[in-house]
Amino acid sequence: ADRPFINEGHPSTLPMFMDYVLRKQYGETSFLVRRASFFGDQIGFHFLRYFGIQWFNTEWIHNTLKIPAGLMSGIAAVIISGLGLVGAWFHNKMNRHSFRYFLSVIILTTVVMVFVMNLSDKEVRDRDYFFVVAYNMWAIWIGIGALALVHLLSSKAGKLALAAILLILPTFNMVSQYKVHDRSKEYIALDYGVNFLNSLEENAIIFTNGDNDTFPLWYAQAVNDPHATQTPVLKGTDVFPTTESSAAIAKAMTYKNKYLKGIRKDITVANLSLLNTPWYIRQLRDHEGVLFGWDDAQLDRLYELRVPSRLDVSAEGANPPMQFSMELDNTPKFRPQEQGYRISDMAVMQIIQENFGKRPIYFAVTCESYIGFEEYTRNEGMVARVTHIPGTDQVNIQRLLHNIDKVYQYRSIEDDDVYKDENMTRLVMNYGSGFVRAAIHYTKMGEYDKALRYVERARHYIDTDIKLTEFYMVFYTATKRWEELDAFIDNTIMTNSLAYQIYPSYVL
């Protein structure tokens, strides 16, 4: 694409292109050092499991026809592997030359692909899309196998009967898989991105964690989707733009208005994972209006950077002053298992230091940490804003209630016709935390009926009561419902595998 909004890897030179092809930004890897057992995990758990779920949805078949899932899996395996092997045999019999070519493609897209991808036993999501060519190749052999069986029968009646059965199989597969793949009413991912963007003040910067809380935002900004609704933009509070920051934002908006067709183009989405790369930092600096003092020479030598012992942050032009400082140890307190700071950690510090007070700055609540700024953030629902006022578990309750009650859309979440996989379920649970915070707030205010209404809304998004522990500890204590408190501790906390962590944190 010409001037893509997000130029992944920015492969504009041969060395950068090779780095992109070799996935250097994800770290060095070796084919010889296996990240998991080749046969047990990479072939068995990953490839064969992915392969199996492409044909007949056993969960749907079990729920609809009451056929045991294990039995259906066995039947499907016999049909799919049997037809494919018959197809391979017939292919070889009819045309050895094309069979050998096809077999080489099958080997490359299965065994060799598994070896090259070297998937770990702790992948963050299913990677079945890596092997889509293998599924298609095997489907061709299945088709040839079906043709072979019809061809081998001598009677016309037998041919017609078998052909009918073989036509029913793909139809049955389509029916069983339809709900899983139907996206006609699925707005969860779109609403996720739109809700994040609409909860931010004008010209905000938001740090996001990974794919799930980044791509939906990019999509909502880049694509003119008629189902994406922009709410009235919240004007910036505690923001004091300078001539430099205003000029940078104006330049960025000229670029973004030209290439983006969606909503909230004023927002800068800064992905923490990509902030480890020089090409992405350049894009934020040059096209997103982010003040960033590292020049190109420094960006080319990122691994020579050293974190300061103290970080001073202040808002230029604020009266009264808005400023705070953080002491930085050699080992990050927010990631004690690692010895040093990541490039992205230093990039976040630099962005906050240079842009604080000039633009609103937020972290998505999905971030694994706030890079040491936890004490200086104030929750507003799905986002936490950086503030100069220190505190523990700070909440802007007015903005939180505004977001969860008036801004966020929750389409598809309670629609049983919309299939939700584990990934979708995890996304949805993030909404629950806002309602829990509202429930705790009203409990502390003595408005117990409101508290119960909000916690009931939280239950729509949170799958187990154990995740409501903080609320029930506060609520039962405030209302002096000691018997219910004891029952919750005995039945919910003490029966949980993490009771040894939860009990000291909330009960003692």
Feature roles, as predicted:
Residues 1-132, 136-203, 214-508:
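ER/secretory pathway lumenal C-terminal domains and tails of membrane proteins involved
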